[in-house]
Amino acid sequence: MHVASAARLGPDYQPCHYGRSKVSFRGPRVEPAGRYAVFLGGNETFGRFIERPFPALIAAAAGIAAINLGCANAGLDLYVKDPSLLEIVAGAETAVIQIMGAQNMSNRFYVVHPRRNDRFVRASATLKALYPEVDFTEYHFTRHLLMALRDQSPGCFELVVEELRAAWVARMRSLLEQVSGRAILLWLSDRAPEDDAEELSPGGEPLLVNREMLAALADTGAELVEHVASPAEIASGREAMIYSELEQAAAREMLGPRVHADVAARLAPFFGAGHEMKRPA
């Protein structure tokens, strides 16, 4: 696998801030004024190891102002609990929301960090009662915690999954209520919503989200766009990714620039850019 110089992207990809939010986003900063689109999501929307993620491709092709609020390892809490970000969402003509996993948000069983949603902060009394034998101080990330809970007691783990899924649907509905313009839900993954959503090993995002959960949002008026990346599609873009040797493992979990180009082409008609963008051959 080719490893390019990470210097081309710069440290943290030109971080910028919006309003009073303490979260850093990928630059360059776009002023949230007039007509604009906003993109919310995790690693793929942020565009880790990619020079031009799909929000930038759409902006260039459609000639629109596009605010990329994608954030590495983001969960829904990053947005629904930040007034500055919700204000941007409410003012957007179109809001594209990448479907994010259900593990990275606070719920009845545990609390996550308000900005780094993949960080496990503490277990609730309810979870401690469900798993009295677990030392929760040993875990710092939500995925590792869930893997341990599943291994300890698959039966109790199903109760946790049920709670996370219910909380995810409620949180998504809350976020969609803040959208004044058109809302587009983007399923961007290497698996279909019908596939195993409980695979906890690296990859498999959005974790724990399935078709039933998407169907529960059908009455919100949001449009659903599904893009399931094939292995060939992912592999064909690897050479164009930019990362250091230390980042190789993380880069292998990303879908890559070919997928971003294809996704941009799928979304282009929503922005009047259907004739300007063509999917790669």
Language-model-detected regions and their locations in the chain:
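Alpha-helical cap/lid subdomain in secreted, periplasmic
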Residues: E87-A281
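Polybasic, low-complexity association/targeting segments
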Residues: M1-A4
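Serine-esterase "nucleophile elbow" of acetyl-processing enzymes
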Residues: L9-A90
